[in-house]
Amino acid sequence: MNHARRKLVKFSLGSLAATALPAWSVSIRAQQPTVSIIDAGGSNVVVCDTADGLVLVDSGTPTYASTLVDQLRAVGNGRVHTLFNTHWHHDNCGANELIGDSGAAIVAHQKTWQRLATQYYVPHEQRYVEPLPETARPTVKFAGKGSLQVGAETIDYGALVLPHTDGDIYVHFRNANVLVVGGAVTPPELDPELDWYGGGWLGGRAQSLDTLLALADDATLIVPAAGRTLTKAELSTERDMTHELYQRLNKLIRSGCSATCMADEGALEGLGRRWQDPQRFLYAAYKGLWAHHYNLAPDIL
């Protein structure tokens, strides 16, 4: 983000329109009457204001943690009621510790709790990521579905099947009609991120996009972990592209194709998408497909 040109944005949430609110030093991506989507260092943070406190989905990058939390204190009653983590990558959990220290509940997939509580390796960066402090880790863990009522807002949430990592979830603000999808969805301007070492793979992404599409209607605001918001029509296009790509790569890997071979065979052509780093994406997709070879075909080996 260009700090020199970043625009300071004032915004209001629902009934707080008459209340003095801070000039945010993070950009507002989109707003609904009770929900704002904030770009906190390249990572989207969703803020829902209710009479019982704020509900957040993800907490931005560590660099923006203090700024984000300081400015949240000026919204509504200034208290974070609940924080959801859509997955365990640290660039989406940056303010977890500060928010957890304030007494907020942190809700996440069981696998996210496990990942945040232990050291894990990032192969493409050749480094280990240390566990987060205990107060930064989820206090409510699940592996299926759940629902939460905070103020007047009904919030449904559920696990997704390995679209990005092994700990992905969605969060659906039913009344506001905002569906937060984390790393399971990527706007077409960005390449899909498949953390193959962390469990994410293309088949899981295709299945998860089916799940998410069934939750949305034509008015739903769909919020990924990074980048702009999407419509249901755009999500449908992403789903169709992902299923087509899965079929192509499945066929190629069964024929003995490597990631480089997939590129040479034009696996990414004609999909209506401009790829930023096609070789990197194909490598991650290839590794993920091999990790899940038992789901491809009985003769894969």
PLM segments and residue spans:
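Active-site metal-binding motif and surrounding structural segment of the metallo-beta-lactamase
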Residues: 63-107
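N-terminal secretory signal peptides and thylakoid transit peptides that target proteins
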Residues: 1-19
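Conserved beta-strand hairpin/beta-sheet module of binuclear metal-dependent hydrolase folds
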Residues: 31-71, 171-173, 177-183
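Active-site neighborhood of phospho(di)ester-bond hydrolases with catalytic His/Asp-centered motifs
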Residues: 57-59, 81-89, 107-110, 180-182, ...
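Metallo-beta-lactamase
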Residues: 53-54, 61-62, 113-160, 165-166, 174-175, 209, ...
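Accessory terminal helices/loops
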Residues: 15-16, 20, 25, 213-221, ...
